[in-house]
């Protein structure tokens, strides 16, 4: 499989100018930059030469975009599916699997997106709840003791199980 690991621009507004400023559409700052990056990734993935034996493409990383934001719409329209949401769908009550917490609210900014051709090989996917739920006081930005559990990121990792 072809694996692409992007980290799209943060929603934080430091240094945002022009179209990178918060457009008040719920996507935060730098949404234009994330949209352009998503379009470039889709274009690159569709033209990047891969051996005929390649099963498909996995785009996995911190996309700094919630599921209904423009970058995820671009990936969906290009035939990529969020694996965690495929196996653990959201309901009106919320999403059972999340990767980030901001001001006490859970959400997903990190994804494993599979191309249609890769989907038959995916056995499962989930968010490993080891970071976002932990208080920042137990985090990597403090002097955490390596002898005890500590928050190593502000995001939870996404795990995917494949039948290869």
Language model features by range: what are they?
Residues 24-28, 144-145:
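A general, composition-driven signal for non-globular sequence regions
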Residues 8, 62-63:
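Active-site metal-binding loops of divalent metal-dependent hydrolases
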Residues 30-38:
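Phosphate/oxyanion-binding active-site loops and adjacent basic polyanion-contact surfaces
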Residues 35, 45-58, 64-164:
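Metal-dependent phosphoester-hydrolase catalytic domains
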Residues 27-31, 65:
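Short, surface-exposed loop/turn motifs that are enriched in glycine and acidic residues
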Residues 3, 58-59:
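Beta-strand elements within well-structured catalytic alpha/beta cores of enzymes
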Residues 1-24, 164:
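Beta-strand-turn-beta hairpins that frame and shape the catalytic cleft
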């Amino acid at each position: 499989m072809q694996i692409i690991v992007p980290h799209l621009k943060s929603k934080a507004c430091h240094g945002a100018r022009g179209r990178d400023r918060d457009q008040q559409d719920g996507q935060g700052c730098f949404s234009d930059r994330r949209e352009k990056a998503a379009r470039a990734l889709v274009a690159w993935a569709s033209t990047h030469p891969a051996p005929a034996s390649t099963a498909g493409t996995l785009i996995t990383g911190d996309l700094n975009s919630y599921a209904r934001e423009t970058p995820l719409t671009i990936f969906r329209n290009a035939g990529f599916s969020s694996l965690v949401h495929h196996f653990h769908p959201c309901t009106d009550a919320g999403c059972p699997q999340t990767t980030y917490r901001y001001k006490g609210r859970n959400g997903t900014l990190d994804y494993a997106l599979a191309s249609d051709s890769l989907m038959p090989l995916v056995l499962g996917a989930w968010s490993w709840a080891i970071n976002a739920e932990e208080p920042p006081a137990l985090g990597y930005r403090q002097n955490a003791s390596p002898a005890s559990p500590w928050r190593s990121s502000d995001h939870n990792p996404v795990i995917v199980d494949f039948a290869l």
